[in-house]
């Protein structure tokens, strides 16, 4: 149980930091991080990039019939968010009426509970997005 929690927090920083990578040769940005640029291949040099957490909804879906794990929060929105830096991430959109979401809406990252694990109720946190206020 604790091993999974430690792995989530310590070994997968993009789960809570919204970090990716940027190719210094062609300028492409990636989420999650990559070690080789698919455009430049070995010629490209990648550096870590911390995203601003701001973006727009590129596409979305309202989930009305979720799995048992998420039935208490239905209906909810899952979207592809295009970040200001150009990378796209898939995330839940929170703090909104699902019927009010539209493609192109501005959103910003927030840090929220993602799930509870097992009988001990160990909570995992991560990024989600909410409409920009």
Curated annotation (Swiss-Prot):
Summary of the function given for this chain in its UniProt record: Functions as a scaffold to connect the acetoacetyl-CoA thiolase and HMG-CoA synthase (HMGCS) dimers in the channeling thiolase/HMGCS complex, which allows for efficient coupling of the endergonic thiolase reaction with the exergonic HMGCS reaction.
Protein name as catalogued: DUF35 domain-containing scaffold protein
Binding site for Zn(2+): 23, 26, 37, 40
Subunit description: Interacts with acetoacetyl-CoA thiolase and HMG-CoA synthase (HMGCS) that catalyzes the first and second step in the mevalonate pathway, respectively.
Pfam families for this protein: OB_ChsH2_C, zf-ChsH2
A molecular function GO annotation: metal ion binding
Keyword entries, A-Z: Metal-binding, Zinc
Keyword Metal-binding carried by entry: yes
Coiled coil (residue ranges): none
InterPro entries linked: ChsH2_C, ChsH2_Znr, NA-bd_OB-fold, Thioester_dehydratase-like
Family statement drawn from the similarity comment of this UniProt entry: Belongs to the scaffold protein DUF35 family.
SUPFAM superfamilies: Nucleic acid-binding proteins
Species of provenance: Methanothermobacter thermautotrophicus (strain ATCC 29096 / DSM 1053 / JCM 10044 / NBRC 100330 / Delta H)
Keyword Metal-binding set for record: yes
